[in-house]
C-alpha cells in the first residue's frame, strides 16, 4: 500500500470548459478499506481506473484532489484525461470499443444516449445502494440518468446557473439598484447605456461547444415564462415543439439582450468571438473615467475558476451574485443548474470501488477546502460549511435547498438528445447572435427539424 500513496496519473491536452454522507454509505467505504487492508496490501492495489471528461484548470485540480484520500487507502490509481473535444472523442471511443472505465459528461442526455446504445453498466451492477443514492442526490437528478427504470448515471458536481454576477460597490457608486424582475433589469440596462456604459458582459465562444451560454439564457427565461417548470419539462422532452410560441417568446427576450444597441460590451462580434471563460474580464477593468467594462454577467457558479487570479478572492464579497430576475410574477421561483454525470463502461472491482467513492459525500471534502474551487457537491447531505470560498457556501446551500424542494431543473440542452442539445441548439444560437432577431423563426424551425 505504501508504494501507491500519493500516486496520480493525470493527462490533459488542450483545455476548454465547458458531502455529510449517510451512515450506511460511509460504513461501506470503511469496510472496503478494511477488506483491502486485510488482503496483504489489497487485491486492488496498483489497479488503474481511467476517467475521461472535460474538466480544466482549477476544476481538474480539484477533481484530482478529491481522489487523494481514496488512493491513499485503497492503492487504486485513478487516471484522468481531459480533452477540448471530449464530447466528440468519447463517441469515437465508444464506437471503437476503446473506452475508459468512466466518462464524466456535462450532459446527462449524453449519458442516456450512451446507455440506450448499450455502452454503459447499470449502477446496480456496480453494487451501488440505489435507495441510498436517490436519498442523497434527489429523485430528480437520479432520474436524469435513468433509462426504462434502470439507473446508469452517477450524479457528480453541480453548479447554479440562475445567477447574475455584479459588483455591489459599482452599483452603489452610481445609485443602481439590484433588479428583481426582468423589466427592472431592462430598465437598469437602459440607464447604464444612457450613462455611456455597457450593462452586460456576454461571450459564448467555446471551441466545439460554442453557443451553450445562449442556451443557458434561453433556459432561465423558459423557467420563468409560459407554465414555468411544467412547460420547461415538456420542452425538454419534446412534448412541446422547439418552435412553440412559448419558446419563441424566450428567444425574443434573449435577442433583446444580445441585439439592443450598447447592451453588450463589444456588441454581437464579441458575443460570438469572446471565449466564455474570459467574458467577465471587462467587469474587472476600469476605463479612464473609472468605469468598469460591464456591470452584469449572467453565468454559472463555476465561472470563478476562470477569473483573473487577483479577483478570485473577492467572489462573494467584492463580486457577488443576485438571482436571475423573475419574468412572470405568478410563477413560483425555480433554479436552473448544471453539473457532471458519470457513466461506467465495466463492472471491474476497481471500477465499483471508484463508483462508490464518487457517490459519497466525502468525495468533495478535499475539493471544498480549496480556495480556488468553483465546483459544488450535488450530494444533498454535503457539509457546506467545508467550503473555503464564501460564495460557495451561499451557492451550495441554494442548490441543496432547491434539490430538496424539487424546484431545481437541469440545463435543458444537456438533457436533450446530443444532436440537438449539443448540436443544433448551440449552432443556431450562434447563428441567431450573428443574424439578429429576424432569424428567430429560422433558428427555432431548424432546431425543431433536427430533433431525432
Where are these regions (language model features)?
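Hinge/lid segment of periplasmic solute-binding proteins
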Residues: 108-163, 186, 192, 213, ...
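Extracytoplasmic/periplasmic substrate-recognition and gating elements
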Residues: 68, 95, 173, 302, ...
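Extracytoplasmic/periplasmic solute-binding protein
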Residues: 150-156, 186-240
Amino acid at each position: 500500500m505504501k508504494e501507491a500513496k500519493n500516486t496520480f496519473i493525470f493527462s490533459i491536452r488542450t483545455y476548454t470548459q465547458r458531502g455529510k454522507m449517510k451512515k450506511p454509505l460511509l460504513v461501506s467505504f470503511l469496510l472496503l478499506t478494511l477488506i483491502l487492508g486485510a488482503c496483504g496490501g489489497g487485491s486492488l492495489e496498483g489497479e488503474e481506473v481511467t476517467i475521461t471528461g472535460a474538466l480544466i484548470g482549477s476544476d481538474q485540480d480539484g477533481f484530482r484532489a478529491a481522489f487523494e484520500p481514496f488512493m491513499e487507502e485503497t492503492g487504486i490509481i485513478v487516471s484522468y484525461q481531459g480533452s477540448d473535444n471530449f464530447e466528440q472523442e468519447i463517441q469515437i471511443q465508444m464506437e471503437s470499443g476503446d473506452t475508459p472505465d468512466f466518462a464524466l459528461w456535462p450532459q446527462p442526455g449524453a449519458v442516456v444516449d450512451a446507455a440506450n446504445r448499450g455502452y454503459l453498466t447499470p449502477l446496480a451492477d456496480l453494487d451501488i445502494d440505489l435507495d441510498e443514492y436517490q436519498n442523497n442526490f434527489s429523485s430528480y437528478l437520479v432520474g436524469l440518468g435513468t433509462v426504462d427504470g434502470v439507473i446508469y448515471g452517477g450524479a457528480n458536481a453541480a453548479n447554479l446557473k440562475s445567477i447574475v454576477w455584479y459588483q455591489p460597490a459599482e452599483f452603489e457608486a452610481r445609485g443602481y439598484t439590484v433588479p428583481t424582475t426582468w423589466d427592472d433589469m431592462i430598465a437598469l440596462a437602459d440607464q447604464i447605456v444612457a450613462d455611456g456604459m455597457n450593462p452586460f458582459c456576454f461571450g459564448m465562444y467555446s471551441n466545439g461547444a460554442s453557443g451553450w451560454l445562449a442556451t443557458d439564457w434561453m433556459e432561465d427565461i423558459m423557467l420563468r415564462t409560459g407554465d414555468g417548470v411544467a412547460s420547461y419539462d415538456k420542452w425538454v422532452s419534446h412534448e412541446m415543439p422547439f418552435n412553440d410560441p412559448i419558446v419563441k417568446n424566450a428567444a425574443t427576450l434573449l435577442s433583446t439582450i444580445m441585439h439592443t444597441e450598447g447592451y453588450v460590451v463589444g456588441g454581437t462580434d464579441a458575443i460570438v468571438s469572446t471565449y466564455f471563460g474570459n467574458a467577465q474580464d471587462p467587469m474587472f477593468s476600469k476605463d479612464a473615467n473609472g468605469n468598469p467594462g460591464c456591470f452584469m454577467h449572467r453565468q454559472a457558479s463555476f465561472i470563478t475558476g476562470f477569473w483573473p487570479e487577483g479577483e478570485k478572492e473577492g467572489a462573494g464579497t467584492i463580486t457577488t451574485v443576485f438571482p436571475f430576475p423573475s419574468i412572470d410574477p405568478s410563477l413560483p421561483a425555480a433554479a436552473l443548474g448544471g453539473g457532471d454525470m458519470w457513466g461506467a463502461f465495466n463492472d471491474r472491482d476497481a471500477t465499483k470501488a471508484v463508483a462508490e467513492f464518487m457517490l459519497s459525500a466525502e468525495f468533495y471534502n478535499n475539493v471544498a477546502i480549496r480556495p480556488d474551487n468553483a465546483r459544488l457537491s450535488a450530494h444533498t447531505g454535503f457539509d457546506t460549511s467545508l467550503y473555503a470560498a464564501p460564495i460557495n457556501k451561499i451557492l451550495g446551500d441554494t442548490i441543496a435547498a432547491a434539490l430538496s424542494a424539487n424546484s431545481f431543473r437541469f440545463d435543458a440542452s444537456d438533457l436533450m438528445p446530443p444532436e440537438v442539445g449539443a448540436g443544433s441548439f448551440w449552432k443556431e444560437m450562434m447563428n441567431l447572435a450573428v443574424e439578429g432577431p429576424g432569424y428567430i423563426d429560422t433558428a427555432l424551425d431548424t432546431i425543431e427539424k433536427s430533433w431525432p
